[in-house]
Structures are given as C-alpha cells and as structure tokens.
C-alpha cells in the first residue's frame, strides 16, 4: 500500500509540538489593522493551540 501524502498547505501552516498538539498563527492580522486596538493586534501575534476537533482533521493531513 502506498504511503499517505502530506498536505503541503497544511504542513506550512501547522507545526506539531513535542506533546503532539498543533500550533498555528491567528487569523485577522494581515490587513484592515487600523480599526483594531494595539492590545488585540499584540494578542493576535502569538501562536495558539488548535482545539481537539480541528486536530483530528490536521492529523490526517500531516501524518508524518
């Protein structure tokens, strides 16, 4: 049976942590930033851990 291919788009967006969780960048920080507060933009700069429901899908896209 052939190996499962890694979804290259997902591989670029999600990184697996040592404990098996996935971290990714927040949305809403690429444009239209003038109306967003400095506090909101600062918080969006940090990475965040995906929820359990999303992890199931990402694990299928990034098997290795």
Curated annotation (Swiss-Prot):
Listed A to Z, the keywords are:
Ribonucleoprotein, Ribosomal protein
GO biological process, any: translation
InterPro entries given in the database record: Ribosomal_bL35, Ribosomal_bL35-like, Ribosomal_bL35_CS, Ribosomal_bL35_sf
Q: Which GO terms describe its cellular component?
A: cytosolic large ribosomal subunit
| A Gene Ontology molecular function term of the record | structural constituent of ribosome
UniProt cross-references to PROSITE patterns, sorted A to Z: RIBOSOMAL_L35 (PS00936)
Domain of life, per lineage: Bacteria
Q: Name one Pfam family in it.
A: Ribosomal_L35p
Quote the HAMAP family the UniProt record gives: Ribosomal_bL35 (MF_00514)
The similarity comment for this entry is: Belongs to the bacterial ribosomal protein bL35 family.
Under PANTHER family, the record lists:
54S RIBOSOMAL PROTEIN BL35M (PTHR33343), LARGE RIBOSOMAL SUBUNIT PROTEIN BL35M (PTHR33343:SF1)
Protein name (Swiss-Prot/TrEMBL): Large ribosomal subunit protein bL35
- Which species expresses this protein natively? Desulforudis audaxviator (strain MP104C)
| Gene expressing this chain | rpmI
């Amino acid at each position: 049976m052939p190996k499962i291919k890694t979804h290259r788009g997902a591989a670029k967006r999600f990184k697996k942590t040592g404990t098996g969780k996935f971290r990714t960048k927040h949305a809403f920080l690429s444009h239209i930033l003038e109306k967003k507060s400095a506090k909101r933009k600062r918080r969006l700069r940090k990475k965040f851990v995906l929820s359990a429901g999303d992890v199931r899908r990402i694990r299928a896209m990034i098997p290795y």
